[in-house]
Amino acid sequence: MNIQLINESDFTERFYDICEKWKLKHNPSSNLALVQTNERLELRKLNQPKLGAVAVNFVDGKMSYRRKFGGGRNEAIVKAVGVKGSYTPTIIDATAGLGQDAFVLASIGCYVKLIERNPIVGALLEDGLQRAYKDLEIGHFMRERMVLLPHSSITGLNPDLDSVDVVYLDPMYPSKTKSALVKKEMQLFQQLVGCDLDSDDLLFPAQQLARKRVVVKRPNYALFLANKKPDFCKETKKHRFDIYLSH
């Protein structure tokens, strides 16, 4: 993976262990850097410092605000996965990224298992989860409801042993416009991860694992995953959720 590994913390051994676990190698010529500070693990673009750093933070900031003041059970993603009344499905988020969608679902009572294929993103996500587990306000439900699995793809799971109610997919998709307003997370992610060119291959294994439905988040302008028409869609201003029911 093309990235610099920089330790700015007092936790040299911990940072070494993270790099070993995720098989990260230092590349001194990269303009992307994974940086361990005393507070967190973060991603920086060294040649564009004004972008700031990207880190996973469930405890405060925008994710905390969304949990407290967002739509809750009225959020589109919550409706898309089938939450209704006292029913909260078990979910695999197979393209977890920074864990933001999974956090919304866990916050309203869903049990979410996360899979992230990119090791740098996986390291960031694990760091954010570990800090959230220790938080007095949200730690109790985070430890129960958000778990990062030691797999890089759902293809490594066994449908007989690992099935859940819902599999959620949100693969990276090319941006329609080169807008200067693209979020810093997306700018860094697009350089780090690129687009998921093999995302079509996720639909079939997802359907094998999902007892009730597969939910695919797409930009409104995007084609259906694997060119397969869903049973129905739920649309928002910029995105839609394509829903494939298990038959």
UniProtKB/Swiss-Prot annotation:
Alphabetical UniProt keywords: Cytoplasm, Methyltransferase, rRNA processing, S-adenosyl-L-methionine, Transferase
Catalytic activity: guanosine(1516) in 16S rRNA + S-adenosyl-L-methionine = N(2)-methylguanosine(1516) in 16S rRNA + S-adenosyl-L-homocysteine + H(+)
Pfam families recorded: SAM_MT
Family annotation (InterPro entries): 16SrRNA_methylTrfase_J, SAM-dependent_MTases_sf
Extent of the signal sequence: none
Domain of life: Bacteria
GO molecular function: rRNA (guanine-N2-)-methyltransferase activity
Record has Methyltransferase as a keyword: yes
Binding sites annotated in the UniProt record for S-adenosyl-L-methionine: E116, R117, S152, S153, D170
Assigned EC number: 2.1.1.242
CC per GO annotation: cytoplasm
Keyword Transferase: yes
Localization terms from the record: Cytoplasm
Function of the molecule: Specifically methylates the guanosine in position 1516 of 16S rRNA.
UniProt record similarity statement: Belongs to the methyltransferase superfamily. RsmJ family.
Protein name: Ribosomal RNA small subunit methyltransferase J
Organism: Glaesserella parasuis serovar 5 (strain SH0165) (Haemophilus parasuis)
